[in-house]
């Protein structure tokens, strides 16, 4: 958690470390604060520090430093629906790797997933504690609240069903005591009634889970401007996934790393030009 104290063109930024010890950093009149705590942490810290909806902050007895009604709004995540198949023979998994960061893991379950990229549904972030930054905030993504997202999920789940009915997938089936062959699922199986939209919609809602692609809360054009400055506060920028209006179609890790590099170089150039 941090808070600012302004005096004669200078800022004292008060923050606490992982051990709960408080520190002060002096920021000059040309200095800046860069907040990069992620799609969950950045809006949470802004709210705790008094940057947010005036009515909401006042209801929590948090002093309003800067009125900004869109902090914590437009929270979104790429929803995922998947099936887990129990595999009855050894096989070589091919887990995804992102910019050589993730490590491979041996599995005995095959997971097949579909996701809705660029969801139109969004929710909000609220504080669970008005004083404690370590308290996990309350986040609602409201998956499939927009009918377009739900319609895309129905199409995606049906594609999974089409794939499961191919000859290539037959080798993953088990033979039951009655001689019939079928898949063994860990968790929910695909709905059997493909012709009924409501049945597949219920499946989408009941089996949705996250791809951990959280974004929103400090959107460009809503909370920060095109240079990622919090609008109305020239000395504060937010540079992370909380500013994204929409995510790339895959894991945003590499995009976020390049955003940090881009903004670092841009700010360095701006400082040199101002000298």
Where are these regions (language model features)?
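FAD-binding beta-loop-beta segment adjacent to the flavin cofactor pocket
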Residues: 114-126, 215-237
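Core beta-strand elements of the Rossmann-like FAD/NAD(P) dinucleotide-binding domain
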Residues: 19-32, 36
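Conserved, non-catalytic sequence blocks in retroelement Pol enzymes and Pol-derived host proteins
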Residues: 19-21, 144-151, 249-254
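A conserved short coil-to-beta-strand element within the FAD-binding core of flavoproteins
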Residues: 1-19, 73
